[in-house]
Amino acid sequence: MSEKRLLASSDIYDVYERDGFAVREYNDVIYKEKCLYAALTHARVETTLVNSFIKIPTLHEVSVVDGRWSITMDFIKGKTMQQLMDENPENMDKYLNQFIDIQTEIHAQYMPLLSKLKDKMTRQIKSLGQIDEIKKYELLTRLDSMPKHIKLCHGNFAPKNIIINDEGTYVINWGSARQGNASADVARTYLLLCLNDPELAEPYLDKYCLKSGTSKQYVQAWLPIVAAAQLIKGKAEEKDLLMKWIDVVDYS
């Protein structure tokens, strides 16, 4: 077995490249359930996308490596769309169109076997300690009133999670995928862009709504909900923006 190379790190798991595979190693035995659920979710998405132009790394095994629960899948070589955007800003419009086409293709898949995005958001909002019970009630009431769909939602769709190489287009990091409303997933992507690449956020939302025929106001109705769901991560640098979005529920 060759030496492993760190690719990414988080509070919950680290991702390594080893022997041509990407290995996600969870940091504590308490994450056994997260590991198994992420593997099941990935496998279901992998099966669903088999006839799509979107490719997904093949999952090979779930195991315990050095006492850590791990998921092993193909390591995909290539550049992320984020890298391509950074290196070729003159082609930003082309990449943004491609980005939206990929997301639209994801939303075209129906996933009745995945857990529901609404259920996940409900749990996240109920567990928040940073907002009062009245605000929670307003958010949960809004969430309950939103149309219920069973479309495939990535949950963390961003340019860094798309890899492009000579074989095609790969989308990675499916652990947060759920069945739900596509506009909730779009609102989530818009939020991620506002936090990490704000100059791209508005062009993305405008172009997505134009290409898909979706009302911008309909996507924006999800913003307080996705902001509340993000708040549970407890990132201090995000709190001001998220609380501002959550407060919109009072008068929207």
Give, region by region, the residue ranges found by the protein language model.
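AlphaC helix of the protein kinase catalytic domain
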Residues: 81-90
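Conserved HxN/HPN-centered segment at the entrance to the catalytic loop
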Residues: 50-61
